Structures are given as C-alpha cells and as structure tokens.
C-alpha cells in the first residue's frame, strides 16, 4: 500500500516536471519570437521607473511564481490601441494580446495561449533565473562586468540587438547596449517587476555606465582643448617677451646717444666742466646751454649797434670836411685794399678827422652811443 502511494507520488512528480518543462519550452519559444522583433508602437525609453519591491521578494528564488502587485503598477501595459501591434510582434498571438519584449500578457492568456492563462503575471516576466537578480542589477548599474550564467541561451543578446536597431530608443539605452551585453544574463526580472527605462535587463545600468564613459571622453577632450589653449598662450607670451626686449634695447641705445650728446655740450659750455662744479644733470645742462646762447646773442647784437653808430659818425665827419674827404677818397683810390680793410674793421677814427681834435669833441660827436669808449672822457676833469 505504501509502495503504491510512493509510486503514485513519483508518477505525479514526473508529470509535474514534464508539465513544467513543456510550459518552459513553449514560453521560451514565444519569448524568443517576441525578442527577435521590437513592436513599432512600443518605446521602452519613455517607460516610468520601476516600483521598488521588498527585499524579501526580490531575493527569494520563488519570486517568479509570486502573484503580481495587486495595484498592477509593476506591469507596463500600453494603451488598448496597441493590442494589434502586440499580437503582430508576438507572431500572430491572441487578438487582444500585448507584445512586449519580456512581457506577454493578453486577454486570452499569457502570450496569447489560453493554456497559460492560469499562470500569474509574474511568471510571464520571469526568465527562470536564480536569486542573483538583485546582485546582477546592482553590479550592472555600477558598470561591473559579470560572467554569463550557465543557462543563458542568448536571448538577451537578441533583445539588445533589437533595442539598438530601434531608432526611437533613447540615447542612453542605445549607448548602454554594448556595455549591458556583457552581463545581461545576470540582470533579471522577477514577478511583478517592470521594465527599466533604459531597456530590458541591464539596459538602464548600461546606459548609466555608458553615460559615465561618455562624460570621461568629454573631460578628455576638454583637457585636450586646455592643452592647446595653454600652448597658444605660451607662444603669445614668448612673442610679447621678444617684442618687449627689442623695445627695451632700442630705448637703451637712444639714452646712450643722448648721454653722449649732453657730455659733449657740457665740455663746450663755460663753467660746466670746472673742478669745483659737479657734473650737471640733463635739465641743468640744457638750461645752462640756453642761457649761454642767449648771452652770446645779446653780445653780438650790441656789437652790431656799436659798429653801425661808428659808421654813421664817420659819414657825418666826412661831409663836414670835403677836403679831407677828397683826400680820403684819393687815398682809397690809390690803395683800395687799405680802404676795404678800414671799412671792414669799422675803426671809428678815420684819417679824415683832424689830428688835433680833443676827447670831448669826439664824445660829443658820438653822444648817442652808450659805450665804454667814452669812459676816458667822463673820468677826466
């Protein structure tokens, strides 16, 4: 009796195992058919963030067979108008079915199969992976590489290829496809969990890792730009330094020439090179040179006036004494060189004047000239 019960229990266990294998095979075929083509009306990049489930359900190996959320927030169901696209994407399933990669839920059952209508919604989302889902998701979001599981059949690669080929996919999900393909089989979905915004499996994590790598590339290009700007600034600084050196050398030569000229001027000006006077400054040298030039000009002007007045007196005396003038003219005709010399010298007392003329008469003759020539007349009594 007990042996019969054991045999019956064993037969029932074998039937359950066979039923489980057949269900798994049919589900995997339909999931693979759904993975091969992404429905045109479904954009996974715009999906809302997943609801966080308790840690007990995410770490439990039986999370695949737990019932879905009572509120239905864990399932991403498109609007009713997308039923036709879902059935077309799932290979001609039920009319009211919804075809989503990794999510096959319809009015006629899971994946349009009425025989699978008894399974909960979480079983359709589970891909028969173990309790390493939470660890794989965390590792993938952090950018770490994970080794594929033994029971991985390459379906995740098909999903990633379809996601990359979709032109409506977000840039984060598309960029993270290559990174997420390495450890995609470890990022799994449990019952009632929704699809991440970046795509199925580790798409969101891949997007973040690719975004971080893209940020690194941007920083690298920024460093390259800063290096080029620093090189250009160094070239400009070198050019400015060379120009400044040339200007300084030119000004130094000019100052040397000016100092030499001032030294020559000090050597010519009186009292500027005496031992009792120290070397004059530039401004003092120029002022002294100006005063010296003005003094010389005044002395020359006084000499011209004196010579003019003496010549005028000589002409008056010659007119008063015609005999003497005639004698002077005859003498000039006989000796023209002597007459020219006398006129050039401007001697005030010519030969035409009487030799017996006294000093007061001479001073009276040149009374308009204030000169030192008549001092002897005024000093004498």
UniProtKB/Swiss-Prot annotation:
Task performed by this protein: Inhibits DNA binding of TCF3/E47 homodimers and TCF3 (E47)/NEUROD1 heterodimers and acts as a strong repressor of Neurod1 and Myod-responsive genes, probably by heterodimerization with class a basic helix-loop-helix factors. Despite the presence of an intact basic domain, does not bind to DNA. In the brain, may function as an area-specific transcription factor that regulates the postmitotic acquisition of area identities and elucidate the genetic hierarchy between progenitors and postmitotic neurons driving neocortical arealization.
The protein's name: Class E basic helix-loop-helix protein 22
Gene Ontology CC entries for this record: chromatin; nucleus
bHLH domain location: 242-296
Tissue specificity of this protein: Brain-specific, with the highest expression in the cerebellum.
Protein's cellular compartments: Nucleus
GO molecular function annotation: DNA-binding transcription factor activity, RNA polymerase II-specific; E-box binding; protein dimerization activity; sequence-specific double-stranded DNA binding
Gene Ontology biological process: axon development; positive regulation of transcription by RNA polymerase II; sensory organ development
Subunit-structure text: Interacts with PRDM8.
Cystine bridges: none
Region feature Disordered, mapped onto this chain: 30-94, 135-154, 188-242
Broad class of the protein's primary localization: nucleus
């Amino acid at each position: 009796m007990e042996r019969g019960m054991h045999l019956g229990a064993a037969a029932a266990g074998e039937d359950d195992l066979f039923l489980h294998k057949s269900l798994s095979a049919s589900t995997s075929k339909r999931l693979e058919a759904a993975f091969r083509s992404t429905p045109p009306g479904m954009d996974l990049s715009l999906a809302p963030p997943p609801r966080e489930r308790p840690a007990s359900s995410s770490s439990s190996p039986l999370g695949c067979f737990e019932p879905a959320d009572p509120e239905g927030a864990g399932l991403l169901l498109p609007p009713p108008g997308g039923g036709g696209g879902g059935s077309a994407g799932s290979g001609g399933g039920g009319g009211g079915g919804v075809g989503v990669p990794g999510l096959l839920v319809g009015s006629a059952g899971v994946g349009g199969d009425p025989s699978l209508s008894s399974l909960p919604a979480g079983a359709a989302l589970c891909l028969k992976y173990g309790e390493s889902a939470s660890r794989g998701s965390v590792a993938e979001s952090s950018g770490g590489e994970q080794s594929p599981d033994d029971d991985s059949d390459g379906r995740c690669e098909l999903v990633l290829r379809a996601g990359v080929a979709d032109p409506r996919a977000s840039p984060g999900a598309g960029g993270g496809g290559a990174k997420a393909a390495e450890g995609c089989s470890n990022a799994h979905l449990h019952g009632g969990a929704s699809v991440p915004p970046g795509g199925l499996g580790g798409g969101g994590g891949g997007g973040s890792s690719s975004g971080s790598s893209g940020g690194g590339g941007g920083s690298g290009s920024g460093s390259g730009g800063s290096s080029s700007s620093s090189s250009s600034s160094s070239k400009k600084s070198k050019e400015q330094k060379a120009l400044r050196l040339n200007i300084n050398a030119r000004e130094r030569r000019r100052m040397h020439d000016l100092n030499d000229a001032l030294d020559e001027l000090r050597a010519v000006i009186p009292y500027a090179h005496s031992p009792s006077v120290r070397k004059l400054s530039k401004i003092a040298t120029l002022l002294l040179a100006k005063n010296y030039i003005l003094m010389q000009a005044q002395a020359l002007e006084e000499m011209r006036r004196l010579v003019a007045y003496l010549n005028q007196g000589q002409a008056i005396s010659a007119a008063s004494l015609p005999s003497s003038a005639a004698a002077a003219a005859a003498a000039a005709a006989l000796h023209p060189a002597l007459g020219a010399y006398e006129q050039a010298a401007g001697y005030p007392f010519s030969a035409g004047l009487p030799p017996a003329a006294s000093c007061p008469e001479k001073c009276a003759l040149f009374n308009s000239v204030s000169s030192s020539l008549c001092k002897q007349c005024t000093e004498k009594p």
